[in-house]
Every structure is written in C-alpha cells, then in structure tokens.
Amino acid sequence: MEERKQKKPSSAMETTTLTRVPESERRPWWRLAFIWAGSVICIPALMVGSMVMAGMDFKQSCLCMVIGYVIVVFYMCLMGIQSSDLGLPCTVAISRAYGVRGSSFLVSLVIAISNIGWFGSQTALCATSFCNIMSGYLHIDFPLWLSCIIWGSLMFITSVYGVKLIDFLNRVSVPALFIMLIWGVIAALMRGAAAAVTVYQPPMVLGWTYGITLAVAGFASGAVTCGDYTRYGKNRKDTILSCVVGVLPAGIGALVIGGFLAVAMGNFDLSVVFSSFGFPIIGMLVLILATWTTNTGNAYISGIAICNMFKLKDGRRPVVTLIAGAAGTALALLGIADVFAGFLNIIAALVPAVAGVAIADYWIMGKGRADLWEPFEGVNWIGVVSWLAGAAVAKWGTFFVPTLMGIVVAIVVYCLGALIIKNEKINPIYAMNLKLTQTAEKE
C-alpha cells in the first residue's frame, strides 16, 4: 500500500507562533537584516534625527546617533540570540525570567498595547501626510477617514500573512527606500543644503545625554521584541549579523538624513521634501513604503503577544493579528492615537526594562545556555519586581540615558534577587542550580 505524501501548504501564511521554529524554517541572516532595515527607516526616525539636531551641531548630532544605536543594537543582539537559541518569540522566551503567567498576563499585555498604539499612531501619520500631499500638490481633496482605512488595512493585512510576506515586502522596499533617501539628499545638496548645514547653529544648546537618549528611544522597544523575528535565525552569528547590518546603517542613516533635511530644507519629512521639489508621487512612495515596512511589525508583534496572553494555538495568529491591526486602525480613524500618546510614554518606559530582566536571567544567571533553560510556571516575582524597578528609573530617572539606566537597574535587581532568595518554588535560578548540583553528585 502506497504511503500518501503530505502536501505542504501552498499558502504564504505563517504557521509557527508560540512553538519552536523548526530548523527547516530558519532563514539566512541577510533576509532578517532586510526586515530590520525596513523597521528603522520610517518617518518618526527622520523626526527623531531633527529633534537631536535641534540641540547640537551636525557633527555632535551624528556622533550621538551612532552611540545611541550602538547601545540599542548591543542589547538587541542579546535578546535576539536568546530567541534564536530557543526558536521562540520574545514573550515565550522570557517565560522563565517572568514566569509563564507573568510573561502572559503582564509583559505580553504591555507589548500588545504598546504596538497596537504605535500602529495607530503611525497609520494616522501616514494617512494625514498622504491627504496633505494629495491636496497640497495634486489638488485632490482626499478624505482622511478613507486614507486611514486604506493604509491601515494594507499594513495589517501584510502582517496577517506573517514573516514570509513581511520578508518579501522589505526585500522589495528597502532598496527602493535607500535609493530615494540618497536621491533626496543629493537633490537637497544641489539646492545649496551643504552651506546651510556648515553654518548651522542650534537654536538651543542641549547636552550629549539628550541626544543619546533620543537616539536610544527611537528603537528601544523594537530591540526588546526582536526575538519575534530572530527566532528564525540559523545561529548566533547570523542573529548578530542580521541585527548589526540591518539596524546600524539604516537606522543611523535615517536619523542623520532627518537631521540634515530639517536644517537644510526646514522639514525632516522626506516625503514633503520630494513634493516641494515637484515630485509628489515620489514623496508618496517614500511615505507609504517607510510606514508600511515599519507598521507591519507593530501589528505582527502585537498579534504574537496576544496569542501568548490567551495561550492560543499557532493557527489563531492570523485572526488575532487582523483584530489587533483593525484596533490600531480604529485608533487612527477615531483620532485617539494622539490622546493615547501620554499613555504610550508610560508603556515606552516599561518595554525596554523587559530586556534587563531577560538579559540577567538568560545570560548572567542562566550562563547563556539554552540547555539549562525551561519555562517557570506561575509568576517569577523576582523578575516582575526587577522589571518595575527598571521601568521606574527609565520613566523618572535623570542620570545619563534613563532608558539604558532602567535596563541596568533591572539587571542588577534581578541578579541580587536570584542570588539572595533560596527557594526553588519562587526562584527558577535557584531551582536550576539545584538540579545542576544534584546531577553532578549523581555522576
């Protein structure tokens, strides 16, 4: 009797969500690098560049941007390697650091809210800019509500299909965005931008800490949840390459170009600059591609976080992602995204501190060994308390770069707690060391 061969699904829909990514589905580093490049080239990144430039000269600004992104990529690599080691997304990979319930009900909730909120904010920005270009340069009065629905839907539908379509989108869009970014700079230089940048003096003098803080904040949350993509990495080397090559050139480039355009042309938004040059269609392409490649990640990550909250089966991710994207679009449509900004600032302090606990748990106390890792049932209160301590420093701290200090505080508090508390029921690190000791004695 002949064995029937199982047909592989022809759909591009992603099928792995909370379970381990099989080796057969792992991807080369350069494909993940394209996803990262697409994530950091966005209109908000250009805006951050202009904000850094508002407080220091061009050379100082560029140096702050480089330092900020090097810091982000350093802890991004640590978070990313853990997920590639385990083959699990961020919210599952930290289920020892926070406990299974702590990861599900606390961290996943914060990550879901954060990314849905940013999806709504970016959709609103894209929709508004699109309408402005249509009316200002093409003399077409396009309804804002329709613009929100069209662009929001396009972005979250891409996320519904998962990493396969996101990968394809970025491989097509990133080269085009690089060409348009370079073209925009050259066009500005031909209009005398170099002279404006050379003689530029910032309207107010702000310290190095200010510039580095802004640069770090631009991708601080994205670096924490990078495991949702790096779980597809083949090994540690590939994960590091994807993060370094994907983020540093594109991320720093976007910040520098944003600052350059703000000084030279009076506007950081490259889409508006192109439109002012008489190329409104190119301006719209920059706007749409830059927002699309970034916003797909917001919906995708929130979908995975919600699946982890309710422990849904892998096959439910597409529906959950669709709902998350629709919720973000509704925020943009109802104009709540701007009102939501204050709440998002609090969430933004909570998300980076997640990395501190995860790094302390896996790399310092867990020795960076995947074979020693296992989820901890219930809530790991050592992790939760450390996270809140780090988040408080990130939100209200004033020393150096508060976001970075929040991560450091979370690391220190977790390590101290893991060393001091000697109870295997509430301390997974103590339980791990106890098992190692017992195994060594048996041998």
Go through each PLM region and give its residues.
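Membrane-interface "cap" regions at the ends of multi-pass membrane proteins
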Residues: M1-K59, V72, L206-I212, R231-L241, ...
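Hydrophobic, membrane-embedded alpha-helices of multi-pass small-molecule transporters
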Residues: W29-A45, I186-R191, Y200-L261, F277-T296, ...
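Transmembrane alpha-helical segments of multi-pass small-molecule transport proteins
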Residues: W36, S108-L109, S135-Y161, P175-G184, ...
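Extracellular loop-to-transmembrane helix junctions
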Residues: M51-I81, G102-L106, V247-L248, M405, ...
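Juxtamembrane transmembrane-helix boundary signature
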Residues: V66-Y98, V107-G117, S121, I421-N427
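Membrane-interface loop-to-helix entry segments
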Residues: A127, L146, I150-A188, Y200-P203, ...
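Hydrophobic alpha-helical segments and their helix-loop junctions in multi-pass secondary transporters
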Residues: S159, P175-Q201, V216-F219, G258-V263, ...
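C-terminal membrane-solvent junction of multi-pass transporters and transport-like membrane proteins
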Residues: V354-E443
